[in-house]
Amino acid sequence: MPKLGMQPIRRRQLIQATLETIDDVGLADATIARIAKRAGVSAGIISHYFGGKDGLLESAMRQILWDLGDAVARRRAQGVESPREHIRAIIDGNFDRSQVNKTVMKTWLAFWSVSMHRPDLQRLQRVNDRWLYSNLCHHFRRCLPRPEAQQAARGLAAMIDGLWLRGALAPQGIDVDRARQLAYDYVEEQLARSTSHAPTDA
């Protein structure tokens, strides 16, 4: 986490420079010097506030995850009420422009790779995974018995990640509309079971 005292606008500037540098040259070659040059600051500023490239990557990912949460919250704020609407808001947030632009997608891929060797980044990834699963499970649980709600949530979380990953690796980029529709179709298949099953407890 960056130290206190940095102005939010400067912090965002450095994070954006990090994302763009990773996009241009990859994580391995995204040196502090390159990031600092792109941001128009000294390398010492980055080292002082972030402790180096690893700290800057962690802060960049925290910002991306904050943007993801905000994308979901904005959709929920539009008056969604039913389980279907809440689940769709989560799907839409995960395929929001803030999560599917080329620069952010490359940073996500770099983060996943590095997090396998960094316990602190692994924790950040687990927090995100748990947030997605628990939110999906909560709303499926409003329609389905617990075991089926849990299974539906696991399946949809895996589908969201899989659709996102295939899109990130596709030469032509991600087809957001198609990805969303595939996820919507899965939700409808799961919710169709609610006509013959009711939740067993709150």
Curated annotation (Swiss-Prot):
Keywords for this protein: DNA-binding, Repressor, Transcription, Transcription regulation
InterPro entries per the UniProt record, alphabetical: BetI_C (IPR039538), DNA-bd_HTH_TetR-type_CS (IPR023772), Homeodomain-like_sf (IPR009057), HTH-type_TetR-like_transc_reg (IPR050109), HTH_TetR (IPR001647), Tet_transcr_reg_TetR-rel_C_sf (IPR036271), Tscrpt_rep_BetI (IPR017757)
SUPFAM superfamilies linked to this entry: Homeodomain-like, Tetracyclin repressor-like, C-terminal domain
Pathway entry: Amine and polyamine biosynthesis; betaine biosynthesis via choline pathway [regulation]
Gene Ontology biological-process annotations: glycine betaine biosynthetic process from choline; negative regulation of DNA-templated transcription
HTH tetR-type domain sequence ranges: 8-68
Pfam families: TetR_C_6 (PF13977), TetR_N (PF00440)
The keyword 4Fe-4S is assigned to this record: no
GO molecular function terms noted in the UniProt entry: DNA-binding transcription factor activity; transcription cis-regulatory region binding
Domain of life, source organism: Bacteria
UniProt cross-references to PROSITE patterns, sorted A to Z: HTH_TETR_1, HTH_TETR_2
Binding region for DNA: 31-50
Protein's name in the database: HTH-type transcriptional regulator BetI 1
Organism name: Chromohalobacter salexigens (strain ATCC BAA-138 / DSM 3043 / CIP 106854 / NCIMB 13768 / 1H11)
Gene: betI1
